[in-house]
């Protein structure tokens, strides 16, 4: 939202502060066409029980999620399956691998930090 706020307030855009952000002002002005290509997501953290580090790419109707810990991927057609119940990674392998490659290239291009194993970690039982 940062580029949108900057544009609405007349402030100078600062791309070095919002590398992959874009202004939504054209949408607010009624322009229904908004093609931003792919949207990328990288979250290399453990947050709560059951959560694991992952990255994702949303391109067109498809969303691919790559779980770093066990290296598995999930692919969803969000137009047909908004609740992400039918994993298409096995039935659309070529699309899944292509999106995973694109996500990997983006991660490399922005020097994304990946999770590393901490041998000193000790779980605390409450």
Predicted features along the sequence, with ranges:
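Phosphate-coordinating loops and pocket residues in cytosolic domains that bind phosphorylated ligands
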Residues: 87-90
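C-terminal structured subdomain/cap of oxidoreductase catalytic cores
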Residues: 78, 92-95
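A glycine-rich phosphate-binding loop feature that marks nucleotide/adenosyl-phosphate handling sites
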Residues: 119-122
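Intrinsically disordered, low-complexity polar regions and short flexible loop motifs
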Residues: 81
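C-terminal cap/loop subdomain of S1 sulfatases and analogous C-terminal strand-loop tails that border
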Residues: 2-78, 113, 125-126
């Amino acid at each position: 939202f940062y580029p949108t706020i900057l544009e609405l307030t007349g402030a100078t855009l600062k791309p070095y502060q919002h590398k992959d952000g874009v202004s939504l002002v054209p949408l607010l002005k009624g322009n229904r066409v908004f093609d931003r290509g792919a949207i990328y997501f990288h979250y290399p953290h453990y947050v709560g029980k059951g959560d694991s580090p992952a990255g994702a790419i949303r391109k067109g109707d498809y969303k691919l999620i790559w779980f770093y810990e066990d290296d598995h991927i999930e692919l969803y057609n969000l137009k047909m399956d908004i609740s992400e119940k039918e994993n298409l990674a096995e039935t659309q392998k070529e699309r899944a691998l292509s999106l995973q490659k694109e996500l990997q290239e983006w991660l490399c291009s922005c020097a994304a930090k990946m999770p590393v194993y901490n041998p000193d970690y000790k779980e605390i039982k409450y």
